[in-house]
């Protein structure tokens, strides 16, 4: 097992590294938990030489042969979450804030369609580079926009920094927050006092009470003990990706070369997530959760 840091800020020449490993026969598959921007670059280089499992939530529409994206899409996740919050809180205007790359832009394009269907106004749409030195100006713009709700599609430390400034400003009193990518570790980093009226939508939360998660947690804590890293959607997706890869190769042999995400191969694999049948496919159950301190609670099945 070779671990490679594919984070943008790591500055690694990821395409060169992976290409060299493939050519040397040093790797037989990729299980990737990284940004969609990295996936798009790698998919052009891998070219079906080895199977590529992409594990986190993403913007949808992946059709590259030999690449299997197993995470949820905005249609499954974002749309139902916005609809539930709109019904519960009746915000008159939404703001859309994200990092400047394909996943936030594609997700926000879908969000704008949802807002139009719900007859709700868009107060602000803004994209910022990774590693923005200060979130103060962005939060200033949000506060002045008149938005009652904000979809936060910032990732990593940018999401943490935004929520800290937002919380210190006390904007939760007038603006609710929704995130599709804030998990348990990010929640702890934001700080307990900065998380009021913050909602997250995901197919997995570490504390959710399902049979699948109970089995997963039992195995996890048996191996790592109670001091193991907090269970979260991104970590679970990597675990699931390895099991998906194993079953894909065991049950389907080399058929993966001509197949892709859209083909919906019946790969029945171990997961901490629960699944529901949607037509001929099984898709993950999606939940909306509310931050309570540095934990998620009040899970609603969407």
Residue ranges and their predicted role:
Residues 21-34, 53-55, 95-96, 146-157, ...:
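Periplasmic-binding protein-like
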Residues 165-236:
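Extracellular/periplasmic periplasmic-binding protein-like sensory domains
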Residues 1-60:
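Beta-alpha junction/loop-to-helix N-cap segments that form part of ligand/metal-binding clefts
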């Amino acid at each position: 097992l070779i671990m490679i840091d594919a984070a943008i800020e790591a500055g690694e020449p990821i395409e060169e590294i992976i290409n060299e490993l493939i050519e040397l026969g040093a790797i037989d598959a990729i299980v990737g938990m990284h940004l969609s921007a990295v996936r798009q670059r790698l998919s052009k280089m891998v070219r079906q030489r080895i199977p590529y499992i992409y594990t986190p939530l993403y913007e949808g529409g992946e059709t590259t042969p030999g690449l299997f994206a197993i995470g949820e899409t905005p249609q499954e996740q974002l749309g139902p979450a916005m609809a539930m919050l709109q019904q519960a809180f009746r915000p008159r205007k939404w703001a859309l804030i994200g990092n400047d790359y394909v996943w936030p832009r594609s997700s926000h394009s879908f969000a704008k369609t949802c807002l139009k269907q719900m007859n709700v106004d868009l107060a602000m749409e803004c994209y910022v580079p990774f590693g923005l030195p200060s979130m103060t100006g962005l939060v200033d713009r949000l506060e002045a926009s008149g938005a009652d709700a904000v979809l936060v599609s910032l990732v990593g430390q940018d999401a943490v920094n935004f929520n800290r400034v937002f919380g210190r400003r006390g904007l939760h009193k007038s603006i609710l927050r929704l995130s599709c990518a804030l998990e348990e570790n990010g929640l702890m980093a934001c700080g307990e006092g900065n998380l009021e009226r913050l909602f997250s939508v995901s197919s997995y939360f570490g504390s959710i009470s399902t049979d699948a998660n109970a089995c997963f947690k039992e195995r996890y804590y048996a191996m790592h003990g109670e001091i193991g890293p907090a269970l979260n959607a991104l970590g679970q997706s990597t675990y699931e990706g390895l099991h998906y890869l194993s079953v894909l190769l065991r049950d389907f042999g080399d058929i993966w070369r001509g197949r892709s995400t859209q083909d919906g191969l019946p790969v029945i694999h171990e997961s901490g997530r629960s699944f529901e049948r949607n037509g001929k496919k099984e898709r993950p159950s999606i939940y909306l959760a509310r931050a309570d301190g540095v934990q998620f609670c009040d899970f609603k099945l969407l």
